[in-house]
Amino acid sequence: MISDMKIIAGRKKFSAIIIVMLISALLLQGCGLFKPTAASLTAKMLKELQKVNSAEVNTKIDSLIGVKVKSIDVGMEMNLGIDNKAEMTKDPERTKENNTLSVSGFGQNVNINYEQYTEKAEDGSKITYVRTEGTPWRKSTEQKQSSEDASGDGSADTGSADTGSGKKPSAFEMIGLLQKAGDTLKDAELKQELVEINGKQAYQINASVGGNLVKELISQSNAGSGKNSIDLESIDWDSISIPTELYIYKESSLPARIKMDCAQLGGEILGNVIADKTENTMLEGVDFEFKTFDVDITIDRYDEIGEIEIPAEALEAEEAGSVEELIPNLSNLF
């Protein structure tokens, strides 16, 4: 009996040793069982992203638009660009942004620089403060949408004019875009080689994002006003595919960068806006085409941002009645 027990104990020890050796061998050899995959990396990224309290978000949008006048068969090109550098905190919910909007083409080059703060008030409303070069601060208040309005009757009275502040996603929405993109990646492929982002090693995942993600983002961005400048239902979102490169920091598992080729999406949206806004105008006979539309978002300095203080003169600013009042020089771009 004792002999049998010794044999069983010996076998258990031997089995345990074999298991340890097997696991060690797998780890040392880099067996696929323990290698990160696109799915495992994005799943962990989404989990870690929920814990973030602050970050620095830099967004660049570069686009090239072809313009053709049908009546005289003349073609031209126009560059549109946005360079946004932002800091964000979750508690309190605030952002500080420096923006440059640029347009070049038709023999001219125009830039508009403006500073912007946003905060979520205690009543749930979103307040945006903006100052362009040489102008005083202006603010826009977007009231929180009531549950009745959220049901979709489109009758929301926001208490302020439609300034269009929701049309450019905030730094928080950029984070949300990363989160949603990571959750809806299609045909994801993890590259074998690590790359360097902001001096840190990162994984690269190539994939595509469906158009319905963008539809949801646009809807959420404009939810407070009860309006959309784009007829979302007239666009075939299912046919839109956005080639995407997602980079995830190796050490922290947090998103480092996302690059999106939005040329197809831009073409659909531009066509929608042009059809709605140019009927019976001088632009009715003009064709527009997005030749390139690249979005590049980089995130760094997670949980390193201190409290964002909104300047006193911004807090005391007058309410803007339109987007032209909020950003006075905007019309100079066109």
Language-model region placement:
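Bacterial N-terminal signal peptides that target proteins for export
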Residues: 3-18
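C-terminal motif of bacterial Sec signal peptides marking the signal peptidase cleavage site
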Residues: 28-30
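Subset-of-secretome marker
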Residues: 32-334
